[in-house]
């Protein structure tokens, strides 16, 4: 790397390298707290292949900046191994005479017993409205948006990775969150331009 230190993610350890030539040594371990799962890294690889870009162009959106102080107080819970289930895709038109956020709560309530639920909204305002609507129904949600304070965002990201039956509500980058036992994904206002990443490669929540 031209004599410079660069950051990387340890994906796996093997007894013998798969490539020939000189290998660089790991000079420093920044954290023992996992920041991704095999499934989330596979998703990142798939998206980068689909958009013909470097995986790091996707990782900068997918994984929030590390906050060391959060990791010091973080206690990882036991992850639930997801079993294979039939994937279904459903388009639902919301009723015009009922608040959209209340209708999303109904969908969450319908699916939360099967596992964790992820709701992606186009902007911060919609995220807050959905979280408020969930709170009225005594449902707690983890918020994941780029506008959050770094500490709060990173803490919620790690909590989503290790909590059971969690409800996560966020903006577009939350689509990559390695949520424990994720079973349901709801994309609110899927035609909104805010679901497009503004930086290259310009992925869309719906496509991911």
Predicted regions and their residues:
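Accessory, non-ATPase domains that flank or precede helicase/AAA+ motor cores in DNA-metabolism machines
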Residues: 1-208
């Amino acid at each position: 790397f031209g004599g410079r230190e660069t950051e990387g993610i340890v994906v796996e350890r093997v007894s013998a390298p798969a490539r020939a030539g000189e290998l660089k040594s790991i000079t420093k371990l920044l954290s023992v707290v996992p920041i991704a799962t095999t499934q989330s890294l596979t998703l990142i690889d798939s998206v980068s292949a689909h958009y013909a870009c470097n995986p790091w162009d996707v990782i900068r959106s997918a994984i929030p900046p590390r906050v060391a102080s959060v990791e010091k107080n973080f206690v990882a819970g036991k992850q639930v191994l997801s079993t294979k289930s039939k994937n279904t895709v459903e388009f639902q038109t919301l009723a015009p005479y009922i608040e959209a956020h209340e209708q999303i709560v109904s969908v969450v309530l319908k699916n939360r017993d099967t596992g964790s639920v992820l709701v992606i909204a186009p902007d911060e305002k919609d995220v807050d409205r959905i979280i408020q609507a969930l709170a009225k129904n005594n449902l707690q949600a983890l918020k994941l948006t780029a506008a959050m304070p770094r500490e709060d965002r990173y803490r919620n990201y790690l909590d989503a990775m290790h909590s059971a039956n969690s409800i996560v509500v966020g903006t577009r980058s939350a689509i990559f969150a390695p949520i424990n036992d994720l079973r349901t994904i709801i994309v609110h206002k899927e035609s909104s331009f805010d679901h497009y990443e503004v930086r290259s490669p310009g992925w869309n929540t719906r496509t991911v």
